Amino acid sequence: MIRTHVLRPSKKSLAAAVELLNSGGLVAFPTETVYGLGARAYDASAARRVYKAKGRPSDNPLIVHVCDEAMLTDVVKRVTPLARRLMDAFWPGPLTLILEKSARVPGAVTAGGSTVAVRCPGHAAARALIRALGEPVAAPSANLSGRPSPTTAAHVLRDLRGRVALIIDGGPCRKGLESAIVDARGKRPVVLRHGTLTAEAIARAAGAPLRVPGGSSPLSPGTKHRHYAPSCRVILVPPALVRRGALAGLSAAGAGLVHRAPWPGRRPAFAVRVRGGAGSYAAALFAALRDAEAAGVRSLYVETVPDRGVGRAVMDRLRRAARR
């Protein structure tokens, strides 16, 4: 079993991370969305170690992270005009673009496909790591496959202790949900996965109407398989039932509640109230799911949010978490 070290961002930890990556090892690092489990993007063997460490299906591609546009040109065949507009508007930030891959990117990273998912993360520590390495980093979320995504180093350690040698602890992730994913190969943006960057903002920056295909896409990481699921049962409830205190099952042993609206009834042993809009809910969601697990909750009642704006991404994750 690998000994796992947790270090704060520093010159020393950065040098250790680069040494590990150059030797074919894996490093978990913070981004503004969720923590990533990184390997050298041009190293097929290292990419396969990512899949093994996570227990990730091999048909689920990885996202390639770059620190600047110069690095991007080695990853993709061509930056389309649409991709250029979206990059200018949102990079560095929580937006992943689907483009045709270059010959340098191995099939182990793209699940054998001809396209690559690529983004420039909006977290200084992530970009510093990529810049120090001098090449892109392929990284899915740093959790066991199917589990809630990690938004703290403690979440990563809980899932991957003994599977990864180094975790860079950059504190809690600001956004708390994975990046939006957009197919930018054509003239119109195709939203393959919703994120905290809304579809409306993407359409405005693109200057073109967007398409949102139904179901999963083989091009997009994180849409094909079961994701975001804690060990406890997740039950989605509308705000009106929370405001009325009309959740009979909440009185049962092992029940918990995550909510925004005021709860007038007796609070269960595990209860998390998130104040603010859908963005605040997004930032707190995965931590709440993991905290409920740790508290021994068996049935977790989670208040829904309106299915618009950032709420689309929140509801996408909640529906997947509730799926059995």
What residue spans do the PLM features occupy?
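Active-site-adjacent structural elements in enzyme catalytic cores
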Residues: 1-324
